[in-house]
Amino acid sequence: GILSTIYIEVNKNVSQNKIKKVLASYYKNDIFIKILKNDTLISTNDVINTNKCHISVCKTKNKNKLIILSAIDNLIKGGSGQGIQNMNLKFGFPLKTGLI
């Protein structure tokens, strides 16, 4: 799997909860994306053999920096799963067909 660690710098008026809410709003209709509770440490074991992506927003010691963690199974969410998902889109099948 792939575990991404993304460091971001935020303005004083942008909180951890605000970032989480933006992500949750953006992905609210995506059945394969799960936004976890703040400061949840994630593992590729949580997404193995799935087309899912788990995302968590974590605090750091520095108040103007946050870490966004994401985990995917690069075989299912990667090449093979991407091919199936694209086929579903092209032919009008339900998005999760062959993936869940």
Over which residues does each language-model region extend?
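C-terminal substrate-binding/catalytic lobe of Rossmann-fold NAD(P)-dependent oxidoreductases
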Residues: G1-I68
